[in-house]
Each structure stands twice: as structure tokens, then as C-alpha cells.
Regions:
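A generic structural motif
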Residues: 46, 175-177, 211
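Short, hydrophobic/aromatic-rich segments at coil-to-beta transitions
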Residues: 35-40, 167-174, 202-209
Length: 290
């Protein structure tokens, strides 16, 4: 897991308050907006994947935020997308992928594929002036979509007398019923950034932890630092505007039948076994598509 330097909260606060906005009209570093704060999160989740059954994983994510906008993303995803955005990078990525496939075909060791497959296709950007989030994600085999949502989709209930400490910050509890799941989050007014992991935002402080009631999805901050890192646009241009529910239904079909789909698309070179009956108890972050 990537670890980030913990710094004094007064320095973080100063950096957040003193932010000066800039526009971003190209991918050049000097033209992109800069973050005030960088928060690393671990996303722990359980899901059902064909014949693999219940899979439990941890994936690192990063939130880059200032008072105007933010981006939540998986760093390995952004790295691969950046490679694929140039001819030389695409050649490098293809070489890595082909080598991993050859090793898998020879040894049938699925672990060799971990370094060359996407562990997430998720990006979430937020525009605080418009109070709108934009979610980019996979929508099936080779399909990628995006959609916009108003911040008002999330209706928070703050529980002032319920507190806990996360990364040394005093946090207050809030809860919401959001798109089929009940969530509990912990936010700290000590860091006046109304943002957090995934789509979560709109509370009077940074959200450091978020968990849904079944224990299948859990975001936990594991590092905070003042940062002037550039908030780059998303490299992948293959995302098409889609409806949120359509994206989730398409992805559900792919996940439920992924082994047979992958086998067919690779001419049988990759065969992870037969698909298995679907267990709907383990599902996506949002379940209201069913």
C-alpha cells in the first residue's frame, strides 16, 4: 500500500485556506489546477466474480482537492491510462501485457496478471461551483461511460454527539441512504474541505472514513498531506455519456459472465473456469439498478 507523509494539521489548514485557483486547458503541468490537499484512501471491498466466488480486495485511491474542484482516482489506473495516451506508452503497455499473458498461459498463475490489469476504472471529479460530480467507470467488456450527478443526491444526517478519531483528527459521524445502501461516514471540521472518497461530499469537513452497513465497502484515509500536485484531466478518451443505471446493469452482466466473455474474446487463451451462479448479496457500491 502506498503511504504518504503525515504533516502538521495547521500546515494543511493554511494550505487549504490560501489556495489560488488556476484554469486547466491542457495536460501541461503548468496549465492544470493545483491541489491544496492530497488524501490517500484504502478501499476495502467484497464482490462476487463468476466462478471465483466472493473476492475480497484492497485498492489504493487518491483524492486531490482544492476549494473549486477535486479528482478521486486509483493511481495505477491513471498510470496505465497515461501510458495508453501516447504511441510509445501504448507499445510499452502492450509489451508488459503480452508478457503477462504468456506467463499465465504457461503457468496458469493468475497473480502474474495483477500488474497489468486494471484494478479499477473509477474516476470521480467534482465541480464545487456547479455542485456536480462526474463519475467515470467501466460499463462492460471494453465499454466505458460517464454521467453527472448533483451533490444534492446525497442527503446527510449529522450525529453531533457521535465522534471518533481518525489519523489523529477528531471526527463527527454522519449517515445517508444513497442509491440502495446505508452509509456511515466520519468527517473532521478541522480540515475545512467539503469532500471525501468516491462521490461523498457536502459535509462541513473532510470525510476520512466511509463504510456501508453490510461491511462490503469501506473507505479509510491512511495519509494526508499538503500538496500542490497538478489535477490532470482524465487521459482516457473512450468514455461515452451514459445513464447511471444503464452503466451499472451493463457492468453487472459483464461481471456475472466475465469468464465466458473473456474466454471468447481471447480465443480461449484466457480461461479462468466456468461462470458460477450469481450471489446478489455481494454487489456494487450502488444497488438501486436492480
Amino acid at each position: 500500500k502506498t503511504s504518504y507523509l503525515m504533516i502538521n494539521r495547521s500546515i494543511i489548514l493554511l494550505g487549504v485556506v490560501l489556495f489560488m485557483a488556476t484554469g486547466c486547458f491542457a495536460r501541461k503541468k503548468q496549465d492544470c489546477p493545483r491541489a491544496d490537499i492530497k488524501v490517500s484512501y484504502n478501499y476495502h471491498y467484497k464482490f462476487w466474480r463468476g466462478s471465483d466466488g466472493v473476492v475480497e480486495k484492497d485498492t489504493p485511491f487518491i483524492l486531490l482537492a482544492n476549494h473549486n474542484e477535486s479528482k478521486f482516482y486509483c493511481p495505477s489506473t491513471e498510470y496505465r491510462d497515461s501510458l495508453l495516451s501516447t504511441p510509445s506508452g501504448s507499445a510499452k503497455e502492450k509489451k508488459m501485457f503480452d508478457a503477462a499473458v504468456a506467463a499465465y498461459v504457461q503457468n496458469r498463475d493468475e497473480s502474474v496478471m495483477d500488474a497489468v490489469v486494471y484494478h479499477s476504472r473509477l474516476y470521480v471529479t467534482k465541480d464545487f461551483a456547479k455542485s456536480v460530480s462526474t463519475t467515470y467507470d467501466q460499463a462492460g467488456m471494453g465499454e466505458y461511460g460517464y454521467y453527472d450527478e448533483p451533490f444534492s443526491e446525497i442527503d446527510w444526517q449529522i450525529v453531533e454527539d457521535s465522534t471518533k478519531t481518525v489519523l489523529g483528527y477528531q471526527c463527527i459521524m454522519a449517515s445517508t441512504d444513497y442509491h440502495g445502501r446505508k452509509w456511515t461516514v466520519w468527517f473532521t471540521p478541522e480540515i475545512p474541505v467539503q469532500d471525501g472518497p468516491w462521490k461523498f461530499c457536502g459535509l462541513p469537513g473532510l470525510i476520512l472514513e466511509a463504510a456501508e452497513e453490510k461491511g462490503h465497502h469501506h473507505f479509510t484515509a491512511d495519509g494526508i498531506e499538503q500538496s500542490s500536485q497538478s489535477i490532470y484531466p482524465i487521459y482516457n478518451n473512450d468514455y461515452e455519456k451514459m445513464g447511471r443505471l444503464d452503466m451499472l446493469r451493463n457492468l453487472r452482466n459483464y461481471r456475472d459472465n466475465n469468464n465466458s466473455i473473456i474466454k471468447a474474446s481471447t480465443g480461449g487463451m484466457l480461461d479462468f473456469g466456468p461462470d458460477a451462479p450469481v450471489q446478489t448479496e455481494y454487489d456494487f457500491l450502488e444497488t438501486d439498478y436492480r
